[in-house]
Structure formats: structure tokens, C-alpha cells
Amino acid sequence: KATEALVADLAQSMPPLAGVLHAAAQFDDRLLLNLDAASMDAVLRTKLVGAWNLHEATLGQPLTHFVLYSSVTTAIGNPGQANYVAANMGLEGLAAQRRSMGLPATCIGWGPIADAGYLTRNEAVKDALAQRLGKAPLAAESALDQLQSIWAEDAGHVTPANFDWPVLARLLPSAAKGSRFAQLNWRYQDANAAHDG
């Protein structure tokens, strides 16, 4: 109700709302064995329920952008963040649903960003993600530059991240064979063939 009231107030006092950028996050990292309903609820409510409320409250608005900040963890996982990954997977589903309705939606599965946000306060998580990806996290300036390109492309889902494909493929053996990473695997093999040839 609060989100609907806010959107209604904006409609009365401002020019038409053109876009939504949902970047809320809540963390309650726990190993799967230690997850409980309260932990799941806290993380899902902030990310997924918040996004759903924005979706419903803006259905009558002439939006050109509806951007949801997700995480690379939906593609590669991260120990202790099952609730966070689940919430972000929900955002990906919401973006797909909106696009199927002919509404704008882009879900950005950000890779680690070194100098802004959560990872600046959580070195252990930053180091774990960098190890899984095989590269240093993105710089905030680089992420903002990529955001401009993402908006221009109108993609449904993108995952901007620095990663080393051989490192990632070793940690996720199914990635080397699976359809989800097929284009990356193909490009890596093609680049290797060109280098060797």
C-alpha cells in the first residue's frame, strides 16, 4: 500500500514517472542447513516483495525502464547465500514476466563491485566471489559505464562481471557443457583456436 500511495502522490506532483530502478538488498548469510523462515522472509521481502510492489504500483505508468538489480550469484552460486540467490532468481522471473506482458524490464545480475556497496564492508564475500570468478571485482566507475550500455540495449537479463572462463569452468564443471554458458564456452574455445592457429 505504501508503494501504491507513493506512486499516486508522484503522479499528482511530478511529471509522469518514466522509470524504476530497484536496487534494494538485504543479507542474512547462512549455510543452507541453518536457514530458517525468518532469514528467508527478511531477504525475500526486501528484494522480491519490494520489486513486486513496484511492479504492481506502476502498471498504469508509461515507464520506459524497469530495472532490477540482481547478482551474478544466480549464475554461479555463493556459499551461504541461498536466500539471496533465491530472491535474485525471483527478480529474474519478474523481469521475464514483465517482458512477456510487453512491459519494460531489465534484470542486471551484477558481478562483484569492489569499491561500492555491500562488498566494501564484507571482504570475505568479496574474496570468495573473486576466487570463484578468477578475476578482480568490477570498479564502480566501470559498472556505471556498463549501465548506460545496458539501458541502450534493452536486454531482458545481463550479467556484467569480470571473470576468467577457465577458472569458472573448473569450479562449475557443468558450465563447460551446459546450455546456460554455451555462448561463453563457444567464444572461449573460438578464441583459443585462433590463438593456437
State where each predicted segment sits.
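4′-phosphopantetheine-dependent carrier domains
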Residues: 1-179, 186-197
